[in-house]
Amino acid sequence: MNQVFNFSSGPAMLPAEVLRKAEQELCNWHGLGTSVMEISHRSKEFLEVAQSSEQDLRELLAVPDNYKVLFCQGGARAQFAAVPMNLLGEATRADYIDGGYWAHSAIKEAQKYCDPQVINVTTEIDSMRAIKPMRDWELSSGGAYLHYCPNETIDGLAIDELPDFGDRVVVADFSSTILSHPLDVSRFGVIYAGAQKNIGPAGLTLVIVREDLLGRASKALPSILDYSVLAENDSMFNTPPTFAWYLSGLVFKWLKAQGGLAEMDKRNQAKASLLYRTIDESYFYRNTVASANRSRMNVPFQLADSKLDALFLQESFAAGLHALKGHRVVGGMRASLYNAVPLEGVQALVDFMLDFARRHG
C-alpha cells in the first residue's frame, strides 16, 4: 500500500510505531489472552497503565508536584462548562480572551454560568490577521480567572507568549498544541486538552489543575465534571475510556523515546517553516496570518483560484495526502502538522503543491 499522510485537524495521525505496537498486542495484551479493551479499569494491570501514563506525562511536561493530572471524558467542549463551574466559587465574572472560533465557543458556553468579560484581541498587521501582544490585553478587575486558547485550529492563529499576569488564575485550552513544545505549566492554573490531536485517539481529555483551585465547584456541577471528585478517585469516578488511555500512554512513551518535547519543538518548527516558505514564495497559494501569529500546528491556505479547490483535494487524496480540506467556516485548505506527521509527509505535500501550481497556474 502507498504511504498515506493524514493532515486532519483531529482525530489526527498517530505515530506508526504506536499503531504497530497496539496491533501486535491487541488480542493478547501482556500475555493475558485478552485485549486491553476487555480488562477491568480497576485491575492491577490497567492501574499500572494509568500510573505509568501519568508519570510519563508529568516527566514530559515537567508538571510541578502541586498540580493534579486528570484523565477525563467529554472533550474540550465539556471543559468549556467545567471550567466556570469549578473555578468561579462566589464570583460571577471571569475574563475571556476572544481570539478565534474556539475561544468564542468557550465564551458562548460560559455565558450559561457566569458573566464573561470578553476581550477581543484580534487585529490586523499590513492586512494580515494577527493577535495583540499580551501587554495590550485590557483585562478587567475582579474576574475569577482568565481563559484563552493559545492556538486556533480553524484560523491558524497562535499565541506563543506565556502569560504573566501576577496572581491572576490563567486557564488555557491547549487541545491543539499540548506536547508539541516545552511548556511552563506553573504559569497556569488549569490546562485542558482534547486528546485527538497530539495525545492519542478521541475519547480522552487531559486536565492539569493546580491543587489550590480544587474545592471551589458549584453545588450544581455534575460530579463527573468536578475536578475534586476526579482527583480523589484517580480519574476513575466512572469507567474511563480505557483503550484511549492505553494508546495515549503509548504515545507518551514514544515522545520520550524521540527525545521529548524539545525534539518535538525542533521538528515542528522545521515542518511549519517548510510549508509556510512554500506558500509565501508561491504566486499560487496564500496564507493571511501575520508571521508572529502563525500556527505551527495548523496551516490554512487558499488557492489563487477557488474553482480549483475540488480538483486540488481530489488529486492530493489520490497522492496519499489526506484531509486537506479547510474548515467549513473558512473554506480553502488546511494542513495540520501535529507531532506524528513526519517531515517526509510535509515534503510530499510541498512537492505536490508545487507540481499542482505548475500544471494549473
Swiss-Prot record:
Listed name of the protein: Phosphoserine aminotransferase
Binding of L-glutamate, residues: S9, R42
Compartments where located: Cytoplasm
The keyword Ion transport belongs to this UniProt entry's keyword annotation: no
Cofactor(s) the record lists: pyridoxal 5'-phosphate
GO cellular component terms attached to this protein's record: cytoplasm
Presence of keyword Phosphoprotein: no
Keywords: Amino-acid biosynthesis, Aminotransferase, Cytoplasm, Pyridoxal phosphate, Pyridoxine biosynthesis, Serine biosynthesis, Transferase
Example GO biological process: L-serine biosynthetic process
Catalytic reaction(s) noted: O-phospho-L-serine + 2-oxoglutarate = 3-phosphooxypyruvate + L-glutamate; 4-(phosphooxy)-L-threonine + 2-oxoglutarate = (R)-3-hydroxy-2-oxo-4-phosphooxybutanoate + L-glutamate
Residues that hold pyridoxal 5'-phosphate according to the record: A76, R77, W102, T153, D173, Q196, N238, T239
This protein's pathway: Amino-acid biosynthesis; L-serine biosynthesis; L-serine from 3-phospho-D-glycerate: step 2/3; Cofactor biosynthesis; pyridoxine 5'-phosphate biosynthesis; pyridoxine 5'-phosphate from D-erythrose 4-phosphate: step 3/5
Family (UniProt): Belongs to the class-V pyridoxal-phosphate-dependent aminotransferase family. SerC subfamily.
Main location: cytoplasm
Function: Catalyzes the reversible conversion of 3-phosphohydroxypyruvate to phosphoserine and of 3-hydroxy-2-oxo-4-phosphonooxybutanoate to phosphohydroxythreonine.
Cofactor note: Binds 1 pyridoxal phosphate per subunit.
Assembly: Homodimer.
EC code(s) of this entry: 2.6.1.52
Listed SUPFAM superfamilies: PLP-dependent transferases (SSF53383)
One Pfam family it belongs to: Aminotran_5
Lineage: Bacteria, Pseudomonadati, Pseudomonadota, Gammaproteobacteria, Enterobacterales
GO molecular function annotation: O-phospho-L-serine:2-oxoglutarate aminotransferase activity; pyridoxal phosphate binding
Cross-referenced HAMAP family: SerC_aminotrans_5
Modified residues (N6-(pyridoxal phosphate)lysine): K197
NCBIfam families referenced in this protein's UniProt entry, alphabetically: PRK05355.1 (NF003764), serC_1 (TIGR01364)
